[in-house]
Every structure is written in structure tokens, then in C-alpha cells.
Amino acid sequence: LKQFLFIFVPLFLVIAIQFLATYFAMGLSLLIENGWYSATGSAGFLDIVDDTFSLWSSQHFNTGVLLIYNAMSIAVFGLWYYCRYGGNYRPALRQTFHPAAIAGIVMLMPGTQYLTTYIMSFVAALFPHWMDAYESLLETAGLDDQISILMVVCSVIFAPFCEELVFRGVTMHQAKKCLPFWAANLLQALLFGIFHMNMIQGIYAFCLGLVLG
């Protein structure tokens, strides 16, 4: 039972790191704002509060939080995966660049993309308010038409690497200690979907997690 319950620890830990990164960035920005206005004496308390809340809702702030969160998560789960599960970060060149492996990836990824797109479109048609909530979340996170290059780097490179360490790395290896492969893969994909905390993205993440597992 202890081994099974330990499967859920990475999910709770990565969520805790998200909150820690957010509160750290909020506290640091508040300290800087107060220090700046105290030094210049150019604004009152309400102006400071208004500027601070505007900063917290900006794309630059969200990008900073994402950078801090990814750095912390990669450090924590990278060490966890390496030390506890003997993770190897050196690619096996013969297996990685084997023609069969490359062909499988070329066929698998577009197929997975089409499948998840159809599933998401079907779900969005049944529950349009889920799609509205998802689009609102993307705008709040800065993933809209005005997205910055740094946010693209965080979202396309750092975030997937972090998520692979958490779910296909630590969670999957822990799950395989007490469950057969199919059950371990199903559970890590389910936790991967839950981690995204919205239905549309969660369904997409669940389907993708099954394939990556």
C-alpha cells in the first residue's frame, strides 16, 4: 500500500512547486515595487497596489513564474529520477536513431495529434463552456497572439522536459514497482491529465500520456 500511495507524491510535489514559484515571484515583485516607490516617493499606497496587481496579471510575470517553476521542477525531479531510479540521461544512439524508431515516431506523432484533435473537438461540441474556460486560461497564461519568444521556449522546451521527468520518469517508474505496465501507464496518464486542471487540456494530456508512456 505504501508503494502505491507513493505514486501520487510527484503530482502533489509538482503542484506545491507551482505554488511556491508563484508566491516567490509575487513576493519578490512586491518587494521591488515597494522599494522603487519608496525610493522615488512618486506614488501612494493605492497606486502601488494597482501597479502590483497589473504586474501579476501580465505576460512577463507569468513567463517569470514559469521559468522559476520549470527550473525548480527540473532540478528536483531530475535528481529524484537519477538517484532513486537510476535514470540515464545519455541517449542510446543506436536505439534512438534506428530507422524503425524514427519511422515509428514519424507515424505516431501525427496520428496522435489527429486523434486527440478529434476527441477534443467532440468534447468541445458537447461541452462548449469547457472550451471557453480553456481559451480564457491560455489568454491568462500569455499563450495568445502576443506570445513572447521566451514564453514559447518555456512552453515548448522546458515545460515538456519537466513533465516528462515528473510523469514518465518518476511517477511511471514508481507505478511499475507495484502495478503491471498497462495499469502503471494508465495511472500516470490519468495523473498527467489531472495535473493540467482543466477538462480540455486534461483530455489531450491523458491521450498523449498514454502514447508517451
Positions of predicted regions on the chain:
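N-terminal, membrane-interfacial amphipathic/helix-forming hydrophobic leader that caps
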Residues: 1-102
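Hydrophobic alpha-helical transmembrane segments
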Residues: 4-12, 63-67, 102-107, 149, ...
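Hydrophobic faces of alpha-helical transmembrane segments in multi-pass integral membrane proteins
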Residues: 9-24, 28, 72, 107-111, ...
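Membrane-water interface at transmembrane helix exits
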Residues: 21-33, 81-85, 116-124, 162-163, ...
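Short alpha-helical linear motifs
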Residues: 31-36, 129, 209-213
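Juxtamembrane helix-loop-helix connectors linking adjacent transmembrane helices
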Residues: 89-165, 173, 177
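Transmembrane helix-loop-helix hairpins at the membrane interface
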Residues: 148-213
